[in-house]
Structure formats: C-alpha cells, structure tokens
Amino acid sequence: MLEARKAYFSLRSQSNKRMEIWAMDTLTDVRGHILSRRIRIGRNVALKSFDDVIPLETIAEINEFIDHLFGDTPERSQSGARIADLLRRGLVFRELEQSICANTRAMAAKIGHTDLPTEAFPVLRCASNTSLAESHCRHYDSHLLTLLIPLQLAPDGVHNGDLVMYRKPRLSVTTLTNVICKIRHGLLHSLPLSWRTWHTLHDLRVGHCRRIRVKPGSVYEFNGFALQHANLDVRNGQRRTLLIHYYDPGHSLGLSTVLRRGRIG
C-alpha cells in the first residue's frame, strides 16, 4: 500500500503538470474576456438541509416509477425530469424550490451574473456495486446550485454511498482555472478504485471532508460549483438520489456539456 501511495502522488504530480501544459496550449488561441471571466463566491457557502419536505408516500411512488421504468438495476444515471415533475406536485417542495432558486439568482446578480440559463438539469443517480467507476470521484459541479433529494438508501456502513463534502470552498474561479480543475479531476477519476478510495478515506481521517448523512423525504441544498464533493461506493443494495442542478455560469468552454451528454447518454 505504501508503494501504491507513492505511485499515486507521483502520477498525480506528473498528470497535473501535463494537464496544465495541455490546457495552456489548447487555450492560447482564446482571447478577450473569456479567460479573464472570474466568479467570486461568498465565504458563507455551506450545505443546508430541509427536513420532511417530501411525503414518504411520494418517495414510495417515485421508487415504484423507477422500478417500472428500469427494473431492479437501473442505469447509473438517467434524466430525472419526470421525477422532478412528480416532486413539484407537492406544494411544500415547489415553494421551497422557488425560494432557493430566487435566493441563488439574487446572489449571482450581486457578482454580475444576471443572464444565467433558467433551465434546470435533473439527474437520477442510481449507485450499486455495478457503478463503482463513479465512486470516490471528487469533483466540482458546473452549476451554482444543486438540490439533492434522497430516494432510497443503501445499508448503512462505509460502503453506503454517502455524499462526502470537502470543507474548504473555492471562492474565486476563472474559466481557465475551472477547465484545468476539470481535467485534473478527470485524470484522478481514471485511477484504480482502491487508490481513489484510499484518497477519500485519508481525507476523511485528517478532516479535509465530512460524510453527509441524509434521509428520504428531506431536501439538501449546496453550491457544488464552490464545494468539492464525491460519493462513497455502494457494495450492497442500491442508493437512489435525484440531483437537480441550476444555473450554469458557463465557465467550462463547453467541456461540461460534453461530459454531461456522455453521462446521460
């Protein structure tokens, strides 16, 4: 394991250098405002939870809907538009979503983002032992707001797919630094699962991040553009989560759109 750790950090250092050179070469022909665009984020970003927003009867109905569509082993990610529509039938969720979105737009307007796209991007994420390639993959979202709605949990333990949230937010991001970060994360995602797992567990032990315990029926709000996060793996059962992303400020030169299409297929 010691040799694996040394190899991991050596590969990470070499990959970072190659990635930075590649990104600079790729972007040398881009001029003007696009590289100088910077988004600044307040220090008070934190995950917020809203308990008992969605009736458990609605959660059960949604899980039956998922079973009917995909069977016992739905693919790791699907468009969650239909599920989001089912949630919006409830007045409490609908009003909460509207309030959170209004607050996010007001925050974005203060930093000069008044023309954010209004279309939400809902994704159904189903994690199991067949989707380990998606586990322990730290990343930042492309969107300023994410609502996380747990639909079904896996058995409790270290392999239950919990969300892992890093404590230190990034507060100032340019298009170039964001693209470089996405490429670096992509290289880390290509590492073996055992290495990615060790890295996550190490960060948990030293306090760089924390596990977020969730429960079906509650709604969780966070700024995934500012807060790095990942998910533990799921070895038994299946964990189902609806993620609704809002307000992509366009700091990825189209890279996020390409990756998004690849995930949803």
What do the PLM-derived regions correspond to, one by one?
Residues 1-104, 218, 254-265:
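N-terminal auxiliary "cap/dimerization" subdomain that precedes the catalytic jelly-roll/cupin core
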Residues 5-9, 16-18, 70-73, 133-138, ...:
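Soluble, non-transmembrane catalytic domains of enzymes that act on hydrophobic metabolites at membranes
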Residues 45, 144, 239-241:
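Short hydrophobic/aromatic beta-strand or adjacent loop that forms the aromatic wall/cage
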Residues 111-123:
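A short coil-to-beta-strand element that immediately follows conserved catalytic motifs
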Residues 122, 147-149, 242-246:
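A structural signal for short, well-ordered beta-strand segments
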Residues 125-127:
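Flexible, solvent-exposed coil segments and beta strand-coil junctions
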Residues 129-216:
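Catalytic core of non-heme Fe(II) oxygenases with the double-stranded beta-helix
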Residues 174, 178, 185-265:
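Catalytic core of Fe(II)/2-oxoglutarate
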